[in-house]
Swiss-Prot record:
Its biological purpose: Catalyzes the attachment of isoleucine to tRNA(Ile). As IleRS can inadvertently accommodate and process structurally similar amino acids such as valine, to avoid such errors it has two additional distinct tRNA(Ile)-dependent editing activities. One activity is designated as 'pretransfer' editing and involves the hydrolysis of activated Val-AMP. The other activity is designated 'posttransfer' editing and involves deacylation of mischarged Val-tRNA(Ile).
Subcellular location: Cytoplasm
Keyword Nucleotide-binding: yes
Gene Ontology cellular-component annotations: cytoplasm
Biological source species: Bdellovibrio bacteriovorus (strain ATCC 15356 / DSM 50701 / NCIMB 9529 / HD100)
Domain statement: IleRS has two distinct active sites: one for aminoacylation and one for editing. The misactivated valine is translocated from the active site to the editing site, which sterically excludes the correctly activated isoleucine. The single editing site contains two valyl binding pockets, one specific for each substrate (Val-AMP or Val-tRNA(Ile)).
Name listed for the protein in its UniProt record: Isoleucine--tRNA ligase
Renumbered ranges of motif 'HIGH' region: 56-66
Length: 1056
């Protein structure tokens, strides 16, 4: 090792101890000052890579779900930027809709639409506008701190006129294509916020609840003491009952109760569930098909709509949706409150009644319950049915029920007048376009999302609300209709100036009738905010009024990413609108992440305080750690993650600090030796250099392959494993080489290799851990002629496939395994690692692998501390090899043949087992079996306590320990104590020292026997051995013990 004072120091000194989080703050300032993000966006000579960012609401603080999606949206664009593309990243804000209105309603104690009109729609919308950017500062801080690069200074807002008129254009295009219609439809409805919800909104908040489950008797007309029975969990819908439905082909039965004489009709298959002891309780009178019941009439339960009997109500009809899975096989029909009810009654010509207002309260049409919320009226309705003699049985049922995802109140299903997108008209095109997209995980495309498309219903896109993009339809009493596509069009047709497109502005504007009839006024309602976010690919540019070229470059998106819930949200609405406009999916690749839960497996909750504050985690452990933790977890496979702060810390401890230590090791030793690279690492004849360069280039190739396919879950684990291999294998086995004096070629090549690896690693890791990558690159690349201002302005590394040496990689895997086996075996026989053993026998069937492994012997023999290594390819002499069926894999494939094939695998010959290990195929019971179908096991033959067996390699150890070997072991322990003293004294790595040692007995014998080894390894120039009773002198002194024997050490560093 060369004295650092005699050479220049090419690199900044690196302290082994580092505060990663503080260091990241410095890098953030560097990026801001040098405008690195802006530089990376330079489009000169580059192709455009298009990315759409789904807009969040700024009415809430960012949580781990946002951070996860944000990291994914950062990693992929960074990667493609380094691949030579320009990747515009424009942030957007979702401004309209229920989330904003809900906040205002809470603040102003608004409980109904009347309260809004009392406040004034303009004032209400001004209040909504005022909170849209409430947490935008916190969002900017968090997004910046996590290391995400996105343009938040020039965002789009869905409430901007330019955005809203693009949404109008989208609506107009669909309208002109006949894909917009007005009609009634039973939809999920939130009484908490007085508006309908889309199906995908309704699916977001299911809860287990207890509801009444009652069986009701409907008395048949002209059939004394005879009733047909129906079962329901929504008693509040019974005042609106207009029909009963049966299944045409279902067998029904008329029975007579022995106790009461009543005659009751129900499905024969459900008789035993209605009567627990049917044989004892009832007598069967008649069997009949459902067709025989159709047309019978019954008495209304309540008098409110009795006059509807003249219009065909209160009769039995047939419906395909009736089953015998539960209840009575007879379904009570309230067409205003059930989708199937609505369609069946419409088909039967029975008009609906809807005695429930927009706030979920009964109207005066049902005076006994008027003013009551529907669910609150259940008890009163049940009591009245009991009084009237219509209640047969009352139970309670526990079931999963949808709640409003905003107000957390139970949803009802309610017929509303709405405007719809005719999704069912374009369903086949939707499904076909989806087939052209790539999903990660891939099963979602044809699974969860594909299934959702298969069952797609027409989309109710109007909302009876205030803060949103108004429906752009004007019409008059005579039925003339105009659909407006822009502000300019509205101004032209109305002759009035239009400053804003919100309802308080446009509702004042009328359009003269082109035929001289009454003026056209805008229809009530605003567009679902999902329609706005689904229009984002067009509206973010103000297309088609402006930015036509920007839109064309960016459509369709190369990449989007959001959570699993968006398969029924943003991904869905994007697909509908893209298909409706251009018959094209608006994205090519989509990465779907799972849900981040609290560590206890529950949903993260502010009230429960069951998760750490994201900013505290970032400031404690750093953004790189959080990023790597998230993207190296099941959540990037759309699975759940139970968030653990310990998991983030483990990334710091196991990955980032190891990476830092490798970097620190290189920089500090290279400074001591004044090393500047020539760039010829690839010419190194050293086998460990060749191995690590092979690993590096294989890693680069894999990263390209998997990142191009957006499979982050196949990228990050390999990157992290490489960091571990770099520190635990390459540097560990090469450490003594860097300690040598001077600069022999082997040492120079090791420096060349480590520099090449660390600089390349900084580029490889840049998209994933942008801070550490920047720090290491800035320091290590400063000696390179073609260095960039930032690692993020570098190109992504490309693999040199000529450097791949799979035989070396296989040998090093075997070396790592045998080192572990050697340590474990020492522990088993109670011999410390410092004591040399005589012989280790390395056993593997492949003579070629053993021959390659022999080349690594100089590296692992010292680590294992054996004096002799023997290589034995005769595995059969030591090891029993067997195979067992991989039941989870084969069971699905083979079904009933599994037992026979499993037995065949168990009795398979060694020749066939080895054939499988070599990549071949074996036929058993007519089935082709490959390596993935079996589990191959190795076990020791006989009773050999000195044998340790592993799938990769096995060893046999000579456990003999002589007194001379014990002395050498003690000498190595003494060396370790001296090195600890040097470090405690804070000496430089290359400082020469004067050493004073006081000891006696076996320690003194070991010191005298191995004096040269101890002084050489510890850079000792002067050694004084003292009696144990003496006290050594030195700049640093300490007293310790080895195996219970006292040793005193004094160290002084010599002048340079």
């Amino acid at each position: 090792m060369t004295n650092a004072n005699t050479r220049s120091t090419p690199y900044s000194a690196v302290k082994p101890d580092v505060n990663l989080a503080k260091q990241e703050e410095t890098i953030l300032d560097f990026w801001d000052q040098e405008k690195i993000f802006a530089q990376s966006l330079n489009p000169e000579g580059k192709k455009t890579y298009s990315f759409y960012d789904g807009p969040p609401f700024a009415t809430g603080l960012p949580h781990y779900g946002h951070l996860l999606a944000g990291v994914l949206k950062d990693v992929v664009p960074r990667y493609w930027t380094m691949k030579g593309y320009t990747v515009p990243r424009r942030f957007g804000w979702d401004c309209h809709g229920l989330p904003v209105e809900y906040e205002i309603n809470k603040t102003h104690k608004i409980e109904s639409r009347k309260d809004v009109f009392k406040m004034g729609v303009a004032n209400y919308n001004d209040a909504c506008r005022s909170i849209v950017k409430r947490y935008s500062t916190e969002w900017k801080t968090t997004v910046r701190r996590v290391g995400r690069w996105v343009d938040m200074e020039n965002p789009y807002f869905t409430m901007d006129v330019s955005f809203m008129q693009s949404v109008w254009w989208v609506f107009q295009q669909l309208f002109n294509k006949g894909l917009i219609y007005e009609g009634y439809k039973v939809v999920p409805y939130s009484v908490g916020i007085s508006t309908s919800l889309s199906n995908f909104e309704a699916n977001q908040n299911y809860k287990m609840v207890q509801d009444p489950a009652i069986t009701v008797m409907f008395k048949l007309v002209n059939q004394p003491d005879t009733a047909i029975m129906a079962w329901t969990t929504t008693p509040w819908t019974l005042p609106s009952n207009l029909a009963l439905a049966v299944g045409n082909d279902i067998e029904y039965v008329k029975v007579q109760e022995k106790a009461t004489g009543r005659k009751l009709i129900m499905a024969q298959a459900l008789l035993s569930s209605v009567f627990k002891k049917a044989d004892e309780e009832v007598e069967v009178l008649q069997m009949m098909k459902g067709t025989e019941l159709v047309g019978l009439t019954y008495e209304p339960l309540f008098p409110y709509f009795g006059d509807r009997a003249d219009k065909g109500a209160f009769r039995i009809i047939s419906s395909d949706h009736v089953t015998t899975e539960s209840g009575t096989g007879v379904v009570h029909m309230a067409p205003a409150f059930g989708e199937e009810d609505y369609y069946a009654c419409a088909k039967a010509g029975i008009p609906m009644v809807n005695p429930v207002d927009d706030d979920g309260m009964f109207t005066m049409e049902v005076p006994d319950y008027a003013g009551k919320r529907v669910k609150e009226a259940d008890k009163d309705i049940i009591a009245d049915l009991k009084k009237r003699g219509n209640l047969f049985k009352q139970d309670t049922i526990q079931h999963s029920y949808p709640f409003c995802y905003r107000s957390d109140t139970p949803l009802i299903y309610r017929a509303v007048s709405s405007w719809f997108v005719a999704v069912e008209k374009i369903k086949e095109e939707l499904i076909a376009n989806n087939k052209q997209t790539s999903w990660v995980p891939d099963h979602l495309r044809d699974g969860r999302f594909g299934n959702w498309l298969e069952g797609a219903r027409d989309w109710a896109i109007s909302r009876n609300r205030f803060w949103g993009t108004p429906l752009p339809i004007w019409r008059n009493a005579e039925g003339e209709v105009m659909c407006i596509g822009s502000r300019a069009e509205l101004e032209k047709l109305s002759g009035q100036k239009v400053d804003d497109l919100h309802i308080e502005f446009v509702d004042k504007i009328t359009i003269p009738s082109p035929t001289g009839k009454s003026p056209l006024k805008r229809v009530d309602g605003v567009l679902d905010c999902w329609f706005e976010s689904g229009s984002m690919p067009y509206a973010q540019w103000g297309y088609p009024e402006t930015s036509v070229e920007d839109f064309k470059k960016a459509f369709p998106a190369d990449f989007i990413a959001e959570g699993l819930d968006q398969t029924r949200g943003w991904f869905y609405t994007l697909s509908i609108i893209g298909t409706a406009l251009f018959n094209q999916a608006p994205f090519k690749n989509v990465v779907v992440n799972g849900l981040v839960l609290a560590e206890d497996g529950r949903k993260m909750s502010k009230s429960l305080k069951n998760y750490p504050d994201p900013m505290e985690v970032l400031n404690q452990h750093g953004a790189d750690a959080l990023r790597l933790y998230l993207i190296d977890s099941p959540v990037v496979k759309a699975q759940e993650l139970k968030f653990s702060e310990k998991g983030v810390y483990d990334i710091v401890r196991k990955i980032l600090l190891r990476w830092w230590n490798s970097y620190s090791f290189f920089a500090n030793y290279a400074n001591i030796d004044g090393f500047v690279p020539k760039g010829d690492a690839k010419k190194s004849p050293n086998i460990l250099d060749q191995w690590v360069l092979s690993r590096l280039n294989g890693l680069i190739a894999n990263t390209h392959k998997e990142m191009d396919a957006y499979r982050l879950y196949n990228v990050v684990p390999h990157l992290l494993q490489f960091i571990e291999d770099l520190t635990n294998t390459y540097i560990r086995f090469n450490r003594s080489l860097f300690w040598q004096d001077g600069m022999p070629e082997t040492k120079r090549y090791a420096y060349e290799t480590l520099h090449e690896v660390l600089v390349t690693l900084s580029r490889l890791m840049a998209p994933f851990a942008p801070f550490m990558s920047e720090v290491t690159y800035k320091n290590l690349a400063q000696v390179l002629k073609d260095k960039k201002d930032s690692v993020h302005l570098e190109s992504f590394p490309t693999a040199d496939l000529s450097m791949l040496r799979p035989e070396l990689e296989e040998a090093v895997k075997a070396m790592d395994t045998l080192v572990t086996l050697g340590r474990n075996h020492r522990e088993k026989i109670g011999v410390k690692a410092k004591i040399p053993l005589n012989e280790i026998k390395i056993i593997h069937r492949s003579a070629e692998l053993l021959e390659t492994l022999k080349k690594f012997e100089p590296f692992f023999v010292d680590e294992l501390n054996f004096r002799k290594v023997v290589y034995n390819p005769n595995e059969d002499q030591f090891v029993q090899v067997t195979a067992k069926a991989n039941f989870p894999v084969l069971g699905k494939r083979l079904g009933p043949k599994m037992k026979a094939v499993g037995a065949g695998i168990m009795s398979m010959s060694l020749e066939n087992i080895l054939k499988l290990e070599g990549g071949g195929v074996v036929v058993i019971e007519g089935e082709e079996i490959s390596l993935s179908d079996v589990e191959i096991r190795r076990a020791p033959k006989g009773d050999n306590a000195n044998l340790s067996v592993h799938q990769i390699v096995s060893i046999e150890v000579d456990p003999t320990v002589t007194p001379e070997q014990e002395r050498e072991g003690l000498a190595r322990e003494i060396m370790r104590k001296i090195q600890v003293a040097r470090k405690t004294a804070d000496f430089q790595m290359d400082d020469k020292i004067t050493l004073e040692i006081a000891c006696d007995g076996a320690l003194l014998d070991a010191l005298n026997a191995h004096k040269d080894m101890i002084t050489g390894e510890t850079l000792t120039k002067n050694l004084n051995i003292l009696a144990l009773t003496a006290e050594p002198n030195g700049k640093h002194t300490e007293t310790s013990d080895i195996d219970g024997q006292v040793i005193k050490i004094g160290v002084t560093n010599l002048p340079r």
